[in-house]
Amino acid sequence: MLIVARALVEGRHRIVQPIDIVGHTLLHHEGAPTAWRQWAAQHGVPEVQTVAGPRFAQYSALIQAALNGLGIGLVPKLLVQEELAEGALLSPCGTPVRVDQGHYLCYRPDRLDLPAFAAFREWIMDEGQKSRGVETEA
């Protein structure tokens, strides 16, 4: 989901449609290196510079940078629901974009024989299924 601080887009820097992000600083998450390129392609904005801009290892740091007006970020909506509800962040252009990344649980097959691990695996898989009902796209 595209996020931006209200102060950054007031006045002549408004973001109403996807093309309006051209010229703004894009904030990148190191774990989602193609997110901006995918967003631009899915929104028909090929002229946006999707490589330049600061990079963050943690979504929390990227979100804080957006809150401080340092640029526009792409983050899972799940991580900014409170900031959006409070109006601290805006999500102009609405439409989220699915990115081609996921989470994986890697383990040795013999670990399923351990009750504690089997319970953890079941729990984490259930949590993943529940989050499918929550908008987690970037």
Q: How would you describe each model-predicted region?
A:
Residues M1-L70, V75-D100, D126-A138:
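C-terminal regulatory
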Residues I3-R6, H103-D113:
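A bilobed periplasmic-binding-protein/Venus flytrap-type ligand-binding module shared by bacterial periplasmic
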Residues R55, K77, R108-R111, R121:
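Basic side chains
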